[in-house]
Each structure stands twice: as C-alpha cells, then as structure tokens.
UniProtKB/Swiss-Prot annotation:
Active site: H50, H96
Residues binding Mg(2+) 1: E94, N558
Binding residues annotated for Mg(2+) 2, in chain numbering: D118, D269
Native source species: Cyanothece sp. (strain PCC 7425 / ATCC 29141)
Binding site for substrate: S95, H96, N97, H98, R117, Q241, E313, S314, Q315, S560
Covalent S-S links between cysteines: none
Single annotated GO MF: magnesium ion binding
Protein name in the entry: Phosphoribosylformylglycinamidine synthase subunit PurL
Length: 782
C-alpha cells in the first residue's frame, strides 16, 4: 500500500516504528493530519503487538474469565482472586523474551521488576516469584552464556528486592536457539482495603510521576518485542531496560503506604511504552484525558526530546492520579523513601492525551486511539493441519529398534533399561535444576513451605501484615505452578495446550491445593505466517476448553509473538509454540500438604489414573516424549490426548487423600513417564522402591516404562491405611488405579521387575542421584 500524500516520513521511518503503511494511513485519518515524530512513536509502541494484541485479541475472547473466586479479571495490571478469611491474592505472568536474547542479565532482571510492579500497583505485597525458562541446547556456547546470564539476572533482582523465587520450570531444546523464553510470574497478597485500579477519574485531579528518573534506556522496547530477532538485534541493547532492585524495594513500600492513605484515585506502572502507555491507558479506562508536562519529569540525561521522554522504558516508575488537595501527602511519602514524586499533569475532561514540552504542545492524541480502538486483525486459520504435522503423526513405535526385557537392541549393541533411565535423568530438561534455584533466595520473607525441587508445585504460607507491621496468623497457604510441554503443543497445538492446563492443575493437586485460576503467557512465532497463526488459534481453543472444564478461569496474562530468529538468509526459524500456564491454588491447612519424595519405608506405591496396561493408547503414548527425543533424536507421533473428566476425578482423589492424611507423597507422571516419576520420588526421599509391572499385554517395554500422558499421579500410602484407601479408590476411580509396589530402605535401590520376576531396571539411589543431580553442571563446565 502506498503512503498518503505529503507524508513527512519515509516508508523506512514508518516501518522502523513497527507500523505498516496501512496503519499509518489509519493514523492520518483518525488525527485528520499527519502525526509529528513524537506522535508517530506513540502510535508505534501502542499499536505494537506487545501492547495492543492486534493479532491475538479475537482469540483471547474465548477464554473463561469469570468465577466464584475471581475479583479482578483481564484488563487490569494483575488478576485477583478471593482466598477466603479476608485474604485476596494478586497474580500475573509476563514475558521478557527479546530483551533477554540481546542482554540476558538486564533483560531477565527487568522482567522480574516489571511483573512485581504489576502486582504491587494493585495494592498487593509481592510474596513469591516463579519463572518458566526455555533455551537451546547446552552444547551450544551461546546458549550457555544466555542461560547463565538469565539466571543471574533473575536471582540478582529477586534477591535484592526481597521476594523469594520459589519455583518454575526450565526446558532445553534446539527450537529455542537464539530466541530464549523468559516468563516470570509473581504473586502478591492484598494489603489495601480496596483493590487499586488504573482508570483515571476526577476532572482536575493531579497526575503524579513517582519513582526513578527518566533516561534513554529501553527506547522502543515494546516495538522491539514485537519483531523477529536477527543478527542486527544484537545491536539493539538500547532497547533493553536497566533495573535497580533496591530502588524498587523502596518503591514497593512507598506505594503500599501511599495506597493505605486513601489519597490515590488510580495507579499505573510505567512498563512497556513508558509514559505513553501509562497516560493513554489510564485516560482511556477512565473515559477522561490527561494533560502532562514533560518539563516537570525528573530526568537522568540532558537534552532529551519528547520522542525520547515518551518512549523511554526506564524502570521503577509509576503514574498516580491523586485526589485534589491530597497530592502533597503522597509526595511526602515518596520523598521519605528517597524517591522522586512530582505533580506532572492533571486529569482533563476532553478524552485526549496532551503532552506539553518547553511551552508548546508536543503531542495531542485521543486516548482511545492509543489504548482501546487499536488495529485488530481477524486472520483466517488453516482449515486442516499443515503437512509437516501429518507426516509427524504418521510415525508409530514400529519405527523404533526392537527391545526386550533387558533393553533396546541397537545397531551399536544393546542399551539396557538401566542405561536408558540414567540417560533420561541426565537430560537437562529432566535433570535437577539445583544449579538454577540455588542462586535464588527462595526463603526470604520466611514463608516458603516447600523448597524448590521438593514438590510438584511451590507452596507459600499466607501471613498478611497488620497495621502495626505484625503478621496475622493464618494456617492456610497458596500453591503456584508454571507448566507447558511445548513439544506436545508443536505436535498438536490443541491437545498440547489442554495438556498444559491439565498438568498445572495436577501439579497443584499433588501438593493438596485446590486449583483456582490461571494466568497464561502465549509465546508464539509470527501470526502473519499461516502456520504460526493456526498454532496460536488452536492452542487458544485448547486452553479455553481445558480452563472451562477444570473451572480455572483466566484472570489475565501476556502474549509474546514474533518469537523467531532470522537465519543468515533471512528465513525465520520459529520457536515451538509455547503457551505457558501459570495456575494458583488454595491450601486450606498447611499441615496437610505433600512433597514428591517417599517418606516412610514400607509405604505402598500406587498409580492413580490411566493404568499402565493402557500404555501405547491415545492417552499414554511415546509420541512427543522425552524418551523419543533424547534416546532416539526423534520429534514425532501424536502427543497424549487429554481426558479432562478423568483428570478431575484423579486430582480430586489425590487432594482428598492428602487432606485425610492417607497420602504420604504425590508426584505427577510427566516427562519420562512412570520410570522417571519413580526415580524422582526415590531421589527426593532418598529411599528405594520395589515395583512389579504386568508386562503380559505390552508390545513394547519402552512404552510401559517411558510413555507419557496425563491423569496419572504416583502416590505412597502407609500400609495400615491400605484397606480404607483401596476401598476409597475403587469407589471413586473404579479401575483407574493400581498398586505398583512398596517403598524400601534409605539409600537402597529402585528395582522394577516384571510380574514373572524378570528384572527390568535395578539402579542404586546413588547412581540415579548422580546422573540427575550433576547433569547441568557437567554441561556448563564442558
């Protein structure tokens, strides 16, 4: 499309702002004139995918967003759910993918800072952080640098700001080479009587700029996050923000103190698009306008022009609307905390964002044009799966080498099941993430109940602060998890997305928590590619269906598109479609929770859900498995199909068993199947297990041992509860359970044998602990 006549900008200048020619023409039509440079930049960031979700918004409308416990849903800085007893939890997930690819330390660190501001802007004190990280192969030196930098950035910011990082997930796959994913989730406990909203109101009310100074760092970060990565992106370090966690700590305390005064009408974090986003969103949500004078903004650099003020993404900054006459009360609070606070503008009746600079008008745009009436693309999705998936789905286990009770029969010789198990445990995706979480302060605030690596979900004690700074005694807790097997989503976006929701709910159930609500982070490639858009659309359909069925409404989230790297020929290399599901759950009694490790010698071991005899069927399969990828270097097959009705039954049984005190340990069967779940329970509890499997109807033993699928939980139960427990299982699950064996002595071995007493796996606790525990360190030191 050609540009309108007399356009003062070249096509290159317009596209540099992330705008298409037709979008520029729409801007001219709405304004009735050509924009100036500052206004062009404002439209560029606010009409970016990162800010306005122009490709994904139609798909997000299918998500369930209402529920009995939902107090705040999508549209605010964070979702809020009711925990009972007067407690309310704010939670949200955000991505910082592109910045972390260019500057891993600061990119990841400021991702933490940004999500924390979303939480305390609502009036909640941050109590926990989790992260979902994706990298390429650790055999690649650049991946090792990115991995180390990202983990260092997260630990630096979280540790300094005093918020514990309590859980998460880390995956490694060549699909993320050059385009890592850094998704950070934060939880906060509401401290204010009223939830702080972001819509401005009250004509004449003062608008306060508070926090840090404004500089040139983070220029155009929102537009940068809405484009593909290339070699040239390495020069985009100015688009990466620089954070100060100690200043953010002061900002948290000052904001929470300010909110409690009742003098704050509305508040908004200055995140993506900085002043532009905060002014336009606050004005648009309130149906009013904001008149702001840039000359009043505290700066850290001289000679800045309006374009730079408006697009800067300097960190640790907020915009407040105060009740007229009470602004000094707020300013005094921020000054006492060593922070900037100035009246920089006012609320006006005309619904526009008016920016003043050096006595003139630098920009004047209808607020809704920037924040609400943004472009929307209704793209046509593919009517059938792409050809590469049809080829992948044609794969069957018949293509694998033959196997026997002793192992795989490879051309190079036999690989025993012991060795297969050890190789899988040493896969960085399955292996211990201790190298990661030992860098995090996961016990600051002293409310972390289960340490990272000890259970399938993080558990945090709820201890709200009272007016005198004492802590209220509450025996309830909150559990949180982040989950997504992106290989499943790549092979079947609809089923894979459903599986992510199901696994998140299952992980919460394994610690005894009732799943409440979801925040999601949709990490996908370009929606302008038909396959990319089809993956996004199918995944959203799967997420929506699973959330409805499991009664876990979506309270908000983040969309990160254009996650692909341009190779030297300019051909995009997309990541796996990765819809990360963050889910929170309520634990009524912290005395009734579970970890994943065996607790007592002699306990009976049960598998709840899909029985092992179904291995190789649609719900439990080798398709898309870690075994297939790691041992056979194959990404193919149909991933497990999700039985949501059975999921609900199995999870309810697990939660009830934990609350009754019947279950001593519970662990989700995920990557690596039943064999890996058994090994991980042995490692966590440092106890062995004797397992007997009926192999009579199994065509391949690798399907029995390593097939993956949902609705499967491994639990241990004391021997004296056997009769009561099995009676309950038969009543609730009918045939969807089986007794597998018994927990053995400390530091013994994991012994898996067939029902006719043939040994399949026999490894010591030391062997599996070493393979699992040192894998990542060994890769990093190679």
């Amino acid at each position: 499309m050609s540009l309108p006549a007399n356009t003062p900008f070249s096509l290159e200048e317009i596209t540099a702002e992330g705008l298409k020619p037709e979008e520029y023409a729409e801007i001219v039509q709405r304004l009735g004139r050509h924009p100036n440079l500052a206004e062009l930049g404002m439209f560029g960031v606010m009409w970016s995918e990162h800010c306005c979700y122009k490709n994904s918004r139609p798909l997000l409308k299918q998500f369930p967003t209402q529920g009995q416990r939902v107090l705040v849903g999508p549209g605010e800085n964070a979702g809020v759910v009711d925990l009972g007893e007067g407690l309310r939890l704010a939670f949200k997930i955000e991505s910082h993918n592109h910045p972390s690819a260019v500057e891993p330390f600061q990119g990841a660190a400021t991702g933490v800072g940004g999500i924390l501001r979303d939480i305390f802007t609502m009036g909640a004190r941050p109590i926990a952080l989790l992260n979902s990280l994706r990298f390429g192969s650790l055999d690649d030196p650049r991946t090792r640098r990115l991995f180390s930098g990202v983990v260092s950035g997260i630990s630096h910011y979280g540790n300094c700001v005093g918020v514990p990082t309590v859980g998460g997930e880390v995956y490694f796959d060549p699909a993320y080479t050059g385009n890592p994913l850094v998704n950070v989730m934060a939880l906060g406990l509401m401290e204010t009587p009223e939830i702080v909203k972001s819509g401005a109101s009250g004509i004449g009310n003062p608008v306060l700029y508070v926090g840090s100074t404004t500089g040139r760092d983070g220029m155009g970060g929102a537009s940068f996050a809405s484009a593909e990565l290339s070699e040239a992106s390495l020069d985009d370090r100015p688009a990466v923000q620089v954070g100060d966690p100690f200043l953010e700590k002061s900002l948290i305390e000052a904001c929470l103190e300010a909110f409690k005064t009742g003098a704050v009408v509305a508040a908004q974090d200055m995140g993506a698009a900085g002043i532009t986003c905060s002014t336009s969103e606050m004005a648009a949500k309130g149906g009013v306008g904001i008149d702001l004078d840039l000359d009043l903004i505290p700066v850290r650099e001289k000679g800045m022009v309006p374009y730079e003020y408006l697009l800067s993404e300097s960190q640790e900054r907020m915009l407040f609307v105060a009740y007229k006459g009470r602004e000094q009360e707020l300013i005094d609070i921020f000054h006492r905390w060593g922070l900037h606070a100035v009246v920089a503008g006012r609320v006006i009746e005309e619904p526009i964002v008016r920016i003043r600079f050096q006595g003139g008008i630098a920009a004047e745009i209808p607020a809704a044009a920037l924040a609400e009436n943004t472009p929307l693309y209704h793209r046509q999705s593919l009517t059938e799966p792409p050809d590469f998936l049809k080829t992948a789905w044609a794969w069957t286990p018949a293509a694998l080498p033959p196997c026997s009770t002793t192992g795989l029969q490879l051309e190079s010789g036999e690989k025993t099941w012991n060795q297969v198990l050890l190789d899988l445990l040493a896969s960085p995706t399955i292996a211990s993430k201790r190298w990661v979480y030992r860098q995090y302060d996961h016990q600051v605030q002293n409310n972390t109940v289960l340490l990272p690596g000890a259970a399938d979900a993080a558990v945090v004690r709820l201890r709200p602060q009272l007016a005198d700074q004492a802590c209220q005694g509450v025996n309830s807790g909150v559990a949180a998890t982040l989950d997504c097997n992106a290989r499943y989503v790549y092979l079947h976006p609809y089923a894979g997305a459903k599986a992510a929701v199901a696994e998140a709910a299952r992980n919460l159930s394994c610690v005894g928590a009732e799943p409440l609500a979801v925040t999601d982070n949709l990490n996908f490639a370009s929606p302008e590619n038909p396959v990319g858009y089809w993956q996004l659309a199918e995944a959203c359909r799967g997420l929506a269906e699973a959330c409805r069925e499991l009664n876990t409404p979506v309270t908000g989230g983040n969309v990160s598109l254009y996650n692909e790297t341009l190779d030297p020929e300019g051909k995009p290399q997309p990541i796996y479609p990765t819809p990360v599901v963050g889910m929170v759950g309520l634990i009524p009694d912290l005395n009734r929770i579970c970890g994943q490790g065996w607790q007592s010698t002699g306990d009976l071991i049960y598998l709840l859900g899909v029985p092992l005899s179904d291995a190789g069927h649609a719900t439990v399969t080798l398709g898309g498995s870690e075994y297939l990828a790691t041992i056979h270097q194959t990404i193919a097959g149909q991933p497990p199909q999700v039985d949501l009705a059975l999921e609900k039954q199995v999870q309810a049984v697990c939660r009830h068993g934990i609350r009754q005190g019947w279950i001593h340990s519970a662990h989700d069967c995920a990557e690596g199947g039943i064999a890996i779940a058994l090994a991980e329970a042995c490692i966590s509890g440092q106890r062995g297990a004797e397992i007997e499997l009926d192999c009579s109807d199994i065509s391949r033993l690798d399907q029995l041992l390593f097939a993956e699928g949902g609705a499967r939980i491994l639990v241990s139960v004391p021997l004296d509860q056997q009769t009561l427990w099995e009676s309950y299982l038969e009543e609730q699950l009918q045939g969807h359970w089986q007794r597998l064996g018994q927990v053995t002595e400390i530091n013994s071995c994991l012994w898996v044998r067939s029902s006719d007493n043939l040994s399949l796996i026999q490894v010591t606790i030391e062997e599996i602990s070493t393979a699992w525990g040192k894998a990542i360190e060994n890769k990093l030191s190679a």
